[in-house]
């Protein structure tokens, strides 16, 4: 069929090709363009012509070269062999391309996404006579030491099991189960295909109630994201977006990470590929690459493939979600994707709106973030999975009032606002605690109450309030000087400095502080807020703040996070700090009992 449906190029405009000669072409259909057969997708159909978005470099294409229709939509190939591999934006494995044509991706190169020659050990979980339908698990494959791949009945297929292969080694193309469906025989292999622009169906959407723990204190404690939630990380150049997202992919407690490098620098992807095979997953002791899939679409790759990479990544994430896994999908950066949309829209002559972006930009952004969520999957056995979507946004000049940032914030539940001033002060992660927000915080507090401490919500709220009050006092102190402030305000500034240095600031490179467990986060915050409460009561009882400032434990509170003894060191320091404050109180003959709720309620 594909040999018969041929047209020809009428016009080439950058990544957009106008073609003619195929009367029954459909929107979204995949076509091969030119003598080299460049992959493209139909994005507009007119009465006598159609526009193709080409996913490869169009240099050298000429009018009258052939355009061949395939009759298929742009699909992701799903099955064993995805995990631990690196793909380009249209799911071509880069390692296979290197073996085939060398270090540079040549135009028109065609490689199967899943290896056809690798045999996987398949264990069937159905027997002859069983009735199966969409989403039912028919067998399992140990894809990597960390991930068990659950082979599912493709969506839209059902029937009675007629034949099952015995446990053994098979390729992704070998039939493993044969069904009888409405008098037809259907062969099921370990691979299936799914159109990337169409969300995969599920049985039921579930509430997002469990936190995605990342080990970064400012995120887990103050601005958490739920499994199945959506988050944005806007920030200017050099504020640490990519490093923050790398930490999420390395240390988050999701079972699978899909990382989309969309239009970012090639060196950053190269750095990831160097780190991931070496870095060890703290929970399993295995390399992190064994639970990761990387889609590399760097800034020097074709612009139009950026859009395909976003949809390809989210489709793969949904596939593993349907198997019952918690997946984190990271898109770095969605701004580059939006720029690609802008360029394609301009080439097609669509009406530009704000800053040249097309009018449908908000719909595209919403479509992407709404594919996240925690769901009950189709089929049996019953299982639930989640896709947590995290997108970096790179506003030009750090301006949050540009369209991509504004529209993104409408559709996400968490924003980690990266601040240029904090980054220049070497305060990392440079997340601004006054601009960031999390709509999941109240729901996730229940998890902290149940698993860590019932007092956690109180400490969290009061610490955030103290930081807000401190920022107002800092503005006054910059005019009159800190020495001119009353003692209670000086104490607020001191505690705020302890929280910033000892809690919010965190190394991303090595040592004890690279990942902080929930219990340690709670005890650090408890120590700092209890220090504030007791010190505030001393000041109210006319004890000078100079007495408190002389405590050597103040500097220890800022450094204990790096102590290799971990939680034990924090608890020991807490006892010493409380004992020291009690000693000061005893010396001045005052009683300590009251929390400083009225100052930072």
UniProtKB/Swiss-Prot annotation:
Has multiple subunits with at least A(3), B(3), C, D, E, F, H, I and proteolipid K(x). InterPro entries: ATP-synt_VA_C, ATP-synth_a_Xtn, ATP_synth_asu-like_sf, ATPase_a/bsu_AS, ATPase_F1/V1/A1_a/bsu_N, ATPase_F1/V1/A1_a/bsu_N_sf, ATPase_F1/V1/A1_a/bsu_nucl-bd, ATPase_F1/V1_b/a_C. Belongs to the ATPase alpha/beta chains family. PANTHER family: H(+)-TRANSPORTING TWO-SECTOR ATPASE, V-TYPE PROTON ATPASE CATALYTIC SUBUNIT A. The keyword Thylakoid does not apply. This is A-type ATP synthase subunit A. Pfam families: ATP-synt_ab, ATP-synt_ab_N, ATP-synt_ab_Xtn, ATP-synt_VA_C. It is found in: Cell membrane. ATP binds at residues 235-242. Component of the A-type ATP synthase that produces ATP from ADP in the presence of a proton gradient across the membrane. The A chain is the catalytic subunit. GO terms for biological process: proton motive force-driven plasma membrane ATP synthesis. It is a peripheral membrane protein. Keywords: ATP synthesis, ATP-binding, Cell membrane, Hydrogen ion transport, Ion transport, Membrane, Nucleotide-binding, Translocase, Transport. GO terms for molecular function: ATP binding; proton-transporting ATP synthase activity, rotational mechanism; proton-transporting ATPase activity, rotational mechanism.
């Amino acid at each position: 069929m594909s040999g018969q449906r041929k047209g020809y190029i009428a016009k080439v405009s950058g990544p957009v090709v106008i073609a003619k000669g195929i009367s029954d072409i459909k929107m979204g259909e995949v076509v091969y363009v030119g003598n080299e057969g460049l992959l493209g997708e139909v994005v507009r159909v007119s009465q006598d012509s159609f526009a193709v978005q080409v996913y490869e470099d169009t240099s050298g294409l000429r009018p009258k070269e052939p355009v061949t229709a395939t009759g298929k939509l742009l699909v992701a190939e799903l099955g064993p062999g995805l995990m631990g591999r690196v793909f380009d934006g249209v799911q071509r494995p880069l390692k296979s391309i290197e073996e085939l044509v060398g270090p540079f991706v040549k135009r028109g190169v065609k490689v199967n996404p899943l290896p056809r020659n690798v045999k996987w050990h398949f264990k069937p979980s159905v027997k002859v006579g069983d009735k199966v339908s969409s989403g039912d698990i028919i067998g399992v494959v140990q894809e990597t030491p960390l991930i068990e791949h659950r082979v599912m009945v493709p969506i839209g297929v059902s029937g009675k099991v007629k034949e099952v292969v015995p446990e053994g080694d098979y390729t992704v193309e070998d039939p493993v189960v044969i069904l009888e469906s409405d008098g037809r025989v259907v062969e099921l292999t370990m691979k299936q295909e799914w159109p990337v622009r169409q969300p995969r169906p599920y049985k039921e959407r579930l509430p997002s109630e469990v936190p995605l723990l990342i080990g970064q204190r400012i995120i887990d404690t103050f601005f958490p994201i739920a499994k199945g939630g959506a988050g944005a990380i806007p920030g200017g150049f050099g504020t640490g977006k990519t490093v923050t997202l790398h930490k999420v992919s390395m240390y988050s407690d999701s079972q699978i990470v899909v990382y989309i490098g969309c239009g970012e620098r090639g060196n950053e992807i190269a750095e990831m590929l160097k780190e991931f095979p070496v870095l060890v997953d703290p929970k399993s002791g295995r390399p992190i690459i064994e639970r990761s899939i990387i889609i590399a679409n760097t800034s020097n790759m074709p612009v139009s493939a950026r859009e395909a990479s976003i949809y390809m990544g989210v489709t793969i994430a949904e596939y593993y979600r349907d198997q019952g896994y918690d997946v984190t999908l990271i898109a770095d950066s969605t701004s580059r994707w939006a720029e690609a949309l802008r360029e394609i829209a301009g080439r097609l002559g669509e009406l530009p709106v704000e800053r040249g972006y097309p009018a449908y930009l908000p719909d595209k952004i919403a479509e992407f973030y709404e594919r996240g969520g925690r769901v009950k999957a189709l089929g049996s056995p019953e299982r639930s999975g989640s896709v947590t979507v995290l997108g970096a946004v790179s506003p030009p000049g750090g301006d949050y009032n540009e369209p991509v940032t504004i529209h993104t914030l409408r559709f996400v539940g968490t924003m980690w606002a990266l601040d240029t001033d904090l980054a220049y002060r070497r305060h990392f992660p440079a997340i601004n605690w006054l601009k960031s927000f999390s709509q999941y915080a109240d729901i996730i507090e229940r998890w902290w109450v149940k698993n860590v401490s019932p007092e956690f919500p109180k400490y969290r709220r009061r610490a955030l309030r103290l930081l807000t009050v401190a920022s107002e006092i800092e503005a006054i102190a910059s005019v009159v000087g800190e020495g001119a402030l009353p003692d209670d305000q000086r104490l607020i500034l001191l505690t705020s400095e302890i929280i910033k240095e000892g809690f919010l600031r965190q190394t991303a490179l090595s040592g004890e502080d690279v990942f902080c467990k929930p219990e340690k986060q709670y005890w650090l915050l408890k120590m700092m807020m209890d220090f504030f409460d007791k010190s505030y009561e001393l000041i109210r009882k006319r004890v000078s703040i100079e007495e408190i400032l002389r405590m050597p434990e103040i500097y220890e509170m800022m450094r204990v996070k790096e102590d290799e003894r971990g939680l034990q060191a924090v608890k020991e320091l807490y006892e010493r700090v409380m004992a020291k404050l009690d000693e000061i109180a005893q010396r001045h003959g005052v009683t300590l009992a009251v929390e400083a709720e009225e100052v930072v309620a």
